[in-house]
Amino acid sequence: EDTRHKSYEAEYVERFHAIISWVHGVFSEFHSRFIGKSSPVHFFWGSFDLAVTRFNGEKAPPRNGADYITREAYSHKNISHGFWCGGGAVLEPAFYGYSAPEPDGFKQAIALPSEAFYHKDLNEFVLPYEAIRKSDSPEKALLDFMQSIYEAAANLADWKREELERPKAQAVS
């Protein structure tokens, strides 16, 4: 039994819960705009990130050297978005967006808002949480980030968007 790591700072846990709850709401709105196969908004306990993924229904090329779980997770073409607390190559809380497989030209795509950038070590777009926190319209800024990544990847990869997206007037929260 782990008795050494059982303490925590309640203030930080409560702040994290408030942030992740808000992010879940925005991710759910983004999720509602898609009628193709998608994951629910879900929390990865291993990497401690909240994510939502859209699939286009096509098989992806196999990932050489990938373990079983990774092979299964990326068996079909997808565009994924998430939020994590940071660590490794990004030392601050941030949102991310990527396409698997990554279509040609994706690295050069324009992501919104202007604080978003392509992280060459992670092969994904990153938007610092601080940029969203300071935004005049945080929900709009986050939805713009997610939509801009999705549109860039889906267009470059020739997804059949008209078959996968809910008409704007029918978006459901």
Label each residue range with its predicted role.
Residues 117-173:
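TerminUS-proximal long segments
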Residues 1-11, 93-96, 121-130:
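Glycine-rich, often proline-containing surface loops adjacent to acidic residues and nearby aromatics
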Residues 1, 44-46, 170-173:
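Charge-rich, acidic-biased intrinsically disordered regions
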Residues 57, 88, 104, 132-134:
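Generic "edge-of-domain/loop-turn" microfeature
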Residues 4-87:
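Aromatic/basic-lined ligand-recognition segments
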Residues 32-36, 106, 155-162:
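Intrinsically disordered or highly flexible coil/loop and linker segments, enriched in small
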Residues 77-126:
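Low-complexity, glycine/alanine/valine/leucine- and proline-rich hydrophobic stretches
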Residues 28, 102, 154:
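Residue-level marker of positions within ordered structural domains that often coincide
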